[in-house]
């Protein structure tokens, strides 16, 4: 077998015809600036070719379903193994996907509960047993000799009616006695029952005395009884306790029976197991009063009610007629703040009236109409069910929130399935345990000898998979956690754990920043896992910026030296010791300490105002209080799963968005938030795409394209032709090429194969028609301007201050290499985030904005982090507040204030361990963040405290 993967002539995207040898069966890290070409080499070249070769080996019939894979732009690759890509872009948004289903642990749980679970009656909770005819007879024969027994078969259980036909059928079949509501009656008599009462009726099949020679007779009687009732038998022991038997899983008391247990009954994705009300989703969308009335301090006239069809209270509207009639009944006006309405008035406003209201009809002649009011919530829910309009549904969905299903209480399964237990827990209760707690439960589980024989192999598989999740630092996750709520790093590590479980060897694994979202404390577990995969005989290529991972690597490849057009070359390839001595590698300069992100000389104290959040209780937060000094750069830190996102994203951002931006968001559980009056808006700068269509690009997103179009419209040529700014837009008719509608590409549908995009043969991919492209500014047409990088455009428009200012902010945040017209869909998460930052920086600051960022260093090289920190500090220098969730110590050390959550993840977290400056956190012995921060701060000059 070859010792290297040899890549020759790689030219994908910005790669500059590179040749590289990557050692096999080693842990190899690819690093370099954002946009330098790391992913182009790892995913778009090496992985794409490995995958393509595998697909090529399949039959043409199979290939039509998998799709045709393009050959990467590379001369050849030698020594390639079957490739598995574990990236962050494949997090499932399917609401039916959970941690348990993704890891396949839930499949083993279904097998376990179906085979060794103990069923109970879902109504009374009594244990249900399934017995054969032989077991029933053995039990009866074990009674004391000469015991008299009536063998009964239940035919009616708790049903109203006279049941005349039941008695007639029993007479025809030759039976002489029945027991009605506990009293034995003769069928020769006329039996009259009250129609309105519930009754229990059992046919007396036989009366026997227990003797050794009676076994044959008892067998016949029991078989007859089970045939009549569908498997149920009651042995009424004279002078003793009655015995109930069932051939099926059925409760003799309640008459509820369940089918024989099978694994599919425990699946919430199967109609046999899924809760019939929520179809296994565990949640239901319902109209939420808090989203209809987000601000109860406003009156109806001021727009307190923000629901489709009910927001306009102008005279003459139907809404105003109902509001006035309700006001007349309850003594309020349209100018009364909603919080001033009585409980009765509020209830009728939302859920309607039983009695008719007197509605004043605004006609010329006037008049009064009497009609009940449906209520805003009831009206919206009815319209949501009845409408066929997608627009109307989306309008109403704005007023809806997801609530746990009232039938299964969020547990997704049918009641009879939830009544099956092992060790006192049903399958949903087990799934709600964290990985650690689930492992503890299985280790202390006591089973019978028979259960051990059946379940031991399954339990071993479950334990192994739980162990793999622990080994990648995910011990705080619950198996019931929806996949869509996981971060990119978490979902990637779950798939990594699944791969370890497969124990394959000779595979090429390509990973994209597996350390994202991991605290330094948990990073060691991840590195041990990667080494374990390597030691099995696999090759790992990891795209990574994390220092610890680089120091643990067998081989490092640094792609650069810059980004975009300035990248795409191999700057360095070798061991980490060699990298530290490299003069050319920026990575080596930062790793060796020759370059660094400086600790600020002064920590800001803030503007004296504070944002205080009390009693936070979302997920694992333990009614925790937080204080954020305004006018500071605040970092929220803590181990993975400690509650950072619960506080910042679920409570802080949603509350601020509702109060300051008027968003219809519902904040997570907390007691109160004070200090809102010191802020005027909140902006969440995440890594979501800045546009989801190829028409969106950095120029349109940042707004600089409007200024560029205005400039072109002011040229003499454009004025002579009568062209306005819209002429230079590729989104409207006029200036764009109509053959491709301004896309520059034509989509050709290939049915079984993926759609193919080819350049438009009319405009040759330039998006505009010939006449528009004839208009030039400083010798360049609009297409050529869009084809410039931000750096090139900065020089080109240097004498146009309005445009130059916007472009300069894009350059400041590190987007100098990005083309103005580059499709937003091709930007990485980090690039999209920096485009948002550039847009914010170019706006005039009010000094009262709070910016929220969740792990902004994702995908960023340390040199890019340096630039990002400078940008965030600029936002704070303008008087704003920046709150960042972060694990990167280079960012944490530059903060003014730190909120450190923990001390552990999951149940062991949710508390504030320490709050203060980085120096104060580093001095806290209980803080894991402090322990790792301390040596970082000690390497720098001591910080002067602000006077």
Report each predicted region and the residues it spans.
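Conserved phosphate-binding elements of NTP-dependent enzyme cores
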Residues: 1-947
């Amino acid at each position: 077998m070859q010792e290297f993967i040899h890549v020759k002539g790689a030219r994908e995207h910005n790669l500059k015809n590179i040749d590289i040898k990557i050692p096999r069966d080693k842990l190899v890290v690819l690093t370099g600036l954002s946009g330098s070409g790391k992913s182009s080499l790892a995913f778009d070249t090496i992985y794409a070719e490995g995958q393509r070769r595998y697909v090529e080996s399949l039959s043409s019939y199979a290939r039509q379903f998998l799709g045709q894979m393009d050959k990467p732009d590379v001369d050849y690759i030698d020594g390639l193994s079957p490739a598995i890509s574990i990236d962050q872009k494949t997090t499932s948004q399917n609401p039916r996907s959970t941690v348990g289903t993704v890891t396949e642990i839930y499949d083993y749980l279904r097998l376990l509960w179906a085979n060794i679970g103990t069923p109970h009656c879902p109504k009374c909770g009594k244990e249900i047993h399934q017995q054969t005819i032989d077991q029933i007879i053995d039990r009866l024969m074990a009674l004391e000799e000469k015991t008299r027994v009536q063998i009964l078969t239940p035919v009616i259980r708790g049903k109203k009616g006279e049941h005349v036909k039941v008695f007639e059928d029993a007479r025809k079949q030759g039976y002489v006695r029945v027991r009605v509501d506990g009293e034995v009656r003769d069928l020769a008599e006329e039996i009259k029952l009250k129609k309105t009462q519930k009754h229990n009726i059992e046919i007396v099949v036989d009366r026997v005395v227990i003797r050794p020679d009676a076994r044959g007779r008892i067998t016949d009687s029991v078989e007859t009884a089970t045939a009549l009732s569908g498997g149920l038998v009651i042995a009424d022991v004279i002078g003793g306790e009655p015995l109930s038997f069932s051939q099926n899983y059925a409760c003799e008391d309640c008459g509820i029976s369940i089918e024989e247990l099978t694994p599919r009954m425990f699946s919430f994705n199967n109609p046999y197991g899924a809760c019939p009300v929520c179809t296994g989703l565990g949640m239901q969308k319902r109209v939420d009063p808090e989203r209809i009335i987000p601000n109860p301090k406003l009156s109806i006239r001021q727009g307190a009610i923000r629901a489709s069809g009910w927001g306009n209270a102008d005279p003459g509207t139907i809404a105003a007629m109902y509001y006035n009639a309700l006001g007349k009944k309850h003594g309020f006006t349209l100018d009364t703040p909603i919080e001033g309405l009585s409980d009765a008035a509020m209830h009728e406003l939302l859920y309607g009236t039983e009695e008719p209201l007197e509605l004043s009809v605004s006609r010329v002649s006037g008049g009064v109409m009497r009609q009940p009011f449906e209520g805003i919530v009831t009206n919206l829910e009815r319209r949501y069910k009845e409408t066929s309009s997608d627009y109307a549904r989306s309008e109403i969905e704005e007023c809806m929130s997801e609530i746990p299903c009232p039938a299964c209480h969020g547990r997704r399964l049918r009641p009879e399935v939830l009544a099956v237990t092992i060790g006192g827990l049903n399958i949903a209760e087990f799934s709600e345990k964290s990985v650690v707690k689930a492992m503890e439960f299985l280790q202390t589980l006591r089973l019978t000898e028979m259960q051990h024989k059946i379940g031991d192999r399954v339990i071993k598989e479950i334990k192994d998979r739980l162990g793999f999740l622990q080994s990648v630092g995910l011990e705080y996750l619950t198996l019931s956690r929806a996949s869509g709520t996981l971060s990119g790093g978490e979902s990637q590590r779950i798939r990594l754990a699944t791969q370890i479980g497969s124990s394959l060897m000779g595979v090429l694994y390509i990973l994209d920043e597996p350390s994202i979202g991991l605290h330094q404390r948990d990073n060691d577990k991840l590195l041990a896992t990667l080494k374990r995969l390597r030691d099995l005989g696999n090759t790992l290529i990891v795209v990574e910026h994390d220092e610890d991972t680089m120091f643990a690597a067998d081989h490092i490849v640094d792609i650069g030296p810059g980004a975009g057009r300035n990248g795409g070359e191999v700057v360095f390839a070798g061991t980490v010791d060699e990298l530290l001595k490299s003069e050319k590698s920026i990575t080596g300069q930062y790793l060796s300490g020759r370059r660094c992100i400086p600790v600020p000389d002064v920590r800001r104290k803030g503007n004296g105002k504070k944002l205080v959040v009390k009693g936070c209780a979302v997920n694992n937060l333990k009614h925790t209080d937080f204080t954020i000094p305004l006018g500071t750069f605040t970092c929220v830190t803590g181990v993975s799963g400690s509650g950072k996102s619960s506080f910042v994203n679920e409570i802080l951002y949603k509350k601020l968005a509702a109060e300051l931006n008027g968003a219809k968001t519902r904040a997570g559980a907390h007691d109160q938030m004070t200090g809102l009056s010191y802020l005027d808006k909140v902006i969440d700068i995440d890594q979501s795409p800045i546009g989801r269509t190829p028409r969106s690009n950095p120029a349109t997103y940042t707004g600089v394209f409007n200024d560029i179009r205005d400039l072109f419209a002011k040229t003499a040529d454009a004025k002579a032709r009568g062209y306005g700014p819209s002429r230079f837009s590729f989104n409207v008719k006029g200036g764009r090429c109509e053959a491709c509608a301004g896309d520059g590409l034509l989509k050709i549908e290939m049915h079984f194969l993926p759609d193919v995009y080819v350049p438009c043969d009319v405009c040759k991919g330039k998006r505009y028609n010939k006449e528009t492209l004839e208009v030039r500014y400083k010798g360049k047409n609009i297409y050529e301007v869009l084809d410039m990088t931000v750096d090139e455009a900065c020089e080109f428009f240097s004498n146009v201050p309005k445009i130059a200012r916007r472009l300069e902010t894009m350059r400041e945040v590190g987007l100098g290499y990005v083309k103005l017209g580059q499709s937003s869909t091709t930007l990485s998460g980090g690039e999209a985030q920096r485009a948002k930052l550039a847009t914010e920086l170019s706006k005039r600051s009010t000094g009262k904005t709070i910016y929220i960022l969740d792990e902004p260093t994702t995908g960023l090289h340390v040199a890019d982090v340096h630039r990002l920190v400078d940008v965030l500090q600029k936002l704070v220098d303008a008087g704003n507040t920046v709150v960042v969730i972060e694990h990167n110590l280079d960012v944490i050390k530059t903060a003014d204030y730190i909120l450190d959550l923990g001390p552990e993840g999951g149940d062991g977290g949710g508390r504030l361990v320490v709050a203060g400056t980085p120096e104060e956190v580093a001095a806290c012995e209980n803080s894991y963040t402090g322990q790792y921060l301390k040596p970082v701060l000690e390497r720098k000059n001591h910080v002067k405290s602000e006077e």
